[in-house]
Amino acid sequence: MVLYIILAIIVIILIAVGVLFYLRSNKRQIIEKAIERKNEIETLPFDQNLAQLSKLNLKGETKTKYDAMKKDNVESTNKYLAPVEEKIHNAEALLDKFSFNASQCEIDDANELMDSYEQSYQQQLEDVNEIIALYKDNDELYDKCKVDYREMKRDVLANRHQFGEAASLLETEIEKFEPRLEQYEVLKADGNYVQAHNHIAALNEQMKQLRSYMEEIPELIRETQKELPGQFQDLKYGCRDLKVEGYDLDHVKVDSTLQSLKTELSFVEPLISRLELEEANDKLANINDKLDDMYDLIEHEVKAKNDVEETKDIITDNLFKAKDMNYTLQTEIEYVRENYYINESDAQSVRQFENEIQSLISVYDDILKEMSKSAVRYSEVQDNLQYLEDHVTVINDKQEKLQNHLIQLREDEAEAEDNLLRVQSKKEEVYRRLLASNLTSVPERFIIMKNEIDHEVRDVNEQFSERPIHVKQLKDKVSKIVIQMNTFEDEANDVLVNAVYAEKLIQYGNRYRKDYSNVDKSLNEAERLFKNNRYKRAIEIAEQALESVEPGVTKHIEEEVIKQ
């Protein structure tokens, strides 16, 4: 037993030793990778990067940047790369002692140092590329500025007439660019690449602005010297022609406004000559806005005249229509009020319409007199005609509505008479059906309903004979009588149908009297109720008796009665 225990312990020890050696082998591979990485980063071309800067002009800012980067290289090597060798050596020693965690910490530290070293290299590479790119950008901007300088100078010289009095100032501004180009060369020669970049970039923007001025100035001069004066002249003579045609354009104030605009225009060219183009554009925009306002007023007058010519005849027709309709209404009201009740407010409205129409006609006459003058402000005439048109339209609508009301009075009377005749005819027809039916007697309530209808009809007939007739009240009463008649007819139909149905049920049930005493008893009760005009109750008892001996038969009998 002891032997087995000893063997087990030995096996466990061997396994543990094997695991330790396996782990050390894995850790050894990590250390080897760190060594390989160290060898790789030692070859990073720090010096080659700096060599690119040495090809530039190592003065001023460039020299300062070069020295700083060179110093950073030394510091990076001493701070990040030099300690790596020691860290790796420590890791190997600890690994030999099977101190895995401590060895791993040393390797991690070594990797962090190498990361920092690589970052330092990457930062140096970016800085070098940035400096080289800035040098290249500076040279490109410089070449462009030189070309622009020559072209701008040539353009002013060749097209001096297009720039007017601004040509001299343009030449002066262009000449200022030459010493600034030379200043760039000095900054570049001194190695001050950042100052050189800021200088040439600012110069390029100023050249762009002056170039835009050179493109804009000929357009501004053309507008100032030709286009606007031409528009002033066209507007002046155009208004003169319109006045000859009869237009009143005093409110446009053409002469005074044009004189004011000419004065304002005279300040534009000096602004252009001083290259104050923003102020010049503002003044031109203001002049154009005022011109547009004048054109709008004139165009409004022309359109107003066309509108006046189109609407004048329409308004004339509407006024005559209103006057004729008013006369017709006055005559018709006097005739109609003898036969029909008419609200006094309607008669007053007609008289009021007469006064309003006469007032509108007077206004229209004044407008026509105004239009006969040698100078007419058609916009005012248009507004006045619109006022007339709106009011006469309202009057015509109201008069037509009143006229339709008078016509409707006759139609309503005829309709009421026709409805009353139909009520009388229908009432007699329904009552005859009640008398000719199988009813033992006409129920008293139908006699009462018939008498009430007769009374209402006589009352309405008496009102028809009276004058003047209040048509609305009469029509309402006839409508109530029609409702009474419909109720009378509906209830009579129900009673007639129920009486036939009850009789059919009793007749059908006679076959069961001998065999079923309870059926015989129920049918006797149904006959008694039938004789007393209680048809619905008779139906209920007869249906119950028949369903007890022959289920479903009552539905069949009811369908036959409905078909009849």
From Swiss-Prot:
Chief location category: membrane
Keyword Metal-binding: no
Compartment(s) where it occurs, according to its Swiss-Prot or TrEMBL record: Cell membrane
Extracellular side of membrane: 1-4
Keyword entries, A-Z: Cell cycle, Cell division, Cell membrane, Coiled coil, Membrane, Septation, Transmembrane, Transmembrane helix
Pfam families in alphabetical order: EzrA
Membrane topology annotation: Single-pass membrane protein
Gene Ontology cellular component annotations, sorted alphabetically: plasma membrane; septin ring
Organism domain of life: Bacteria
Transmembrane segments: 5-23
Keyword Iron-sulfur: no
Topology feature Cytoplasmic, residues: 24-564
Biological process according to GO: division septum assembly; septin ring assembly
Residue ranges of coiled coil: 101-138, 190-223, 271-300, 350-435, 471-550
Family of the protein in this entry: Belongs to the EzrA family.
Function: Negative regulator of FtsZ ring formation; modulates the frequency and position of FtsZ ring formation. Inhibits FtsZ ring formation at polar sites. Interacts either with FtsZ or with one of its binding partners to promote depolymerization.
Protein name: Septation ring formation regulator EzrA
Taxonomic lineage: Bacteria, Bacillati, Bacillota, Bacilli, Bacillales
